[in-house]
Amino acid sequence: MARSRLTATSVSQVQENGFVKKLEPKSGWMTFLEVTGKICEMLFCPEAILLTRKDTPYCETGLIFLTLTKTIANTYFYF
C-alpha cells in the first residue's frame, strides 16, 4: 500500500504560509483512502463550504476548494 510522502516539515511550511494543509497526490503519494478520509472529515465539519468552479471564478478547471469559513485557512485538494 502506498503511503504519504508528505513530511512534517512540508506541512509546517504550508501552515506558516497561512494554509492548514496542502495535499497534492500528483507530487506526493497518498492513498485513495487517506485523501477520501480527509475530505469526508472536513465535509462533516459544520463550518465547511465546498466551492467548485461554478461557485467562484477563482477556481480553475479540476480544482475543488474546501473552505473553513470561521478561519482564514483553506485546504486545497488537487485531482
From Swiss-Prot:
Origin superkingdom: Eukaryota
GO molecular function terms attached to this record: cysteine-type endopeptidase activator activity
Tissue expression as described in the entry: Expressed in leukocytes, lung, spleen, liver, heart, kidney, muscle and uterine cervix. Down-regulated in cervical cancer.
Record keywords: Tumor suppressor
GO process terms (BP): apoptotic signaling pathway; cellular response to UV-C
Entry function: May act as a tumor suppressor. Promotes apoptosis of cancer cells.
Name under which the protein is recorded: Suppressor of tumorigenicity 20 protein
Species lineage: Eukaryota, Metazoa, Chordata, Craniata, Vertebrata
Gene: ST20
